[in-house]
Regions:
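Carbohydrate-associated surface elements
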Residues: 36, 55-58, 70
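A short, active-site helix/loop in glycosyltransferases that binds the activated sugar's phosphate group
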Residues: 19, 28-51
Length: 205
């Protein structure tokens, strides 16, 4: 029964090969968590546009919100310390030095360069935590690669965020600072869940 059931395939990255879309006749819809992934699927895998729906990462809007926000002297980068984020982190080290801010890194260390960058007096490191909102709420601004969860969480807390677009090697393609959007509700957990439910209803009708 299972092999023949219609399916939805969700893709979470356009730069990690393990996230390449599965092409199978039982897959009736693809979900891309950002527009760039949709373009990647259309251009590199010839998946028709009408088969791809952009549904963003859901974020708990009760956990991440404007209340108790403040502004301390650090730029926050949340994410695994690995090859994919190395160039962005190095760029942020220089940026924060120029503007007189500290750079706080929060995430699992899965690289070989953390010890070296911590030699910079204005760089601090914290391990992964389930209470990342405590860091976001007090930050000056945040930064991350692609349009990821941390950027959305930051917007919900009223913080601007730098988005670094990188290639599969982590090299910077572009960077741009984004203010919180006016349509922030599209990232709310219940709204995202409803959109996914609607897509399943469509393919099962």
């Amino acid at each position: 029964m299972y092999p023949e059931l219609p399916k939805i395939c969700a893709i979470h990255s356009e730069v990690i090969s393990l996230e390449d879309p599965v092409v199978d006749p039982t897959i009736k819809k693809y979900v891309a968590i950002r527009p760039e992934i949709k373009e990647h699927m259309m251009n590199n895998f010839e998946i028709p546009e009408e088969m791809i729906e952009v549904i963003y990462n859901p974020v708990d809007n009760e956990k991440f919100q404007l209340k108790n926000a403040s502004e301390e002297n650090y730029v926050l980068f949340v994410g695994t310390i690995d090859y994919l984020r190395k160039e962005s982190i190095l760029d942020l080290i220089e940026y924060t030095k120029e503007i007189g801010k500290e750079l706080w890194l929060v995430g699992e260390n899965n690289g070989n360069y953390l010890e070296n960058i911590l030699l910079e007096d204005h760089v601090r490191y914290f391990p992964s935590t389930w209470k990342v909102e405590d860091f976001i709420l007090k930050s000056y601004e945040t930064a991350g690669i692609q349009l990821g969860r941390t950027t959305i969480e930051s917007w919900m807390c009223g913080k601007s965020s730098w988005i670094y677009k990188v290639d599969s090697g982590g090299f910077i393609l572009s960077k741009e600072k984004h203010e919180p959007p006016t349509d922030i509700e599209k990232y709310y957990t219940m709204n995202v869940a409803q959109k996914i439910k609607d897509e399943y209803i469509k393919i099962l009708e």
